[in-house]
Amino acid sequence: PEQAQQAAQVMGAIQDDPNSRQVLNVVQRYAEAFSTLDAYDRGELVRPDGTPDLRVLDAAECRDVVRELAASQGVEGTLFGNERTEGGLEAAVAAVYQGFGGVDAYPSVEEKAANLLYLVVKDHPFSDGNKRIGSCLFLHFLARNGLLGKDGRSPITNGMLVALTLMV
């Protein structure tokens, strides 16, 4: 009874305070995300199966994507997309297909795409445009494996793509 009274008092105070109501709304709206983060912290997050790799991506195809991106952005002939060192792009692409004992380090398309984004942004294989190129290759990899816009809508918004890329 005493705990119920305390809870009622807290709820009453929240309803009277606009800032508290706003915080409560945020907490309720993102409760699932907070639970997932808590499960991760406790080591209880279950790794989703993901989608098996259907189509292998290679460095030559990545270069084609980079050329198309440069053309669409009007930056052909600039430093954009120029490879800084020989083999840098190949290393990034090969890394997403690495494994040990016949087991892929990144078994799903989603994990491979995310790691390709990470490696291109972090390793800077290009003189300019690594974030744009990495995010474009990420989307291309998902699309070529049927995971981008199956229903005509993209599951990744522009804002999400920017946030993912900048968090690398």
Label each region the model flagged.
Residues P1-V168:
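FIC/Doc superfamily catalytic core
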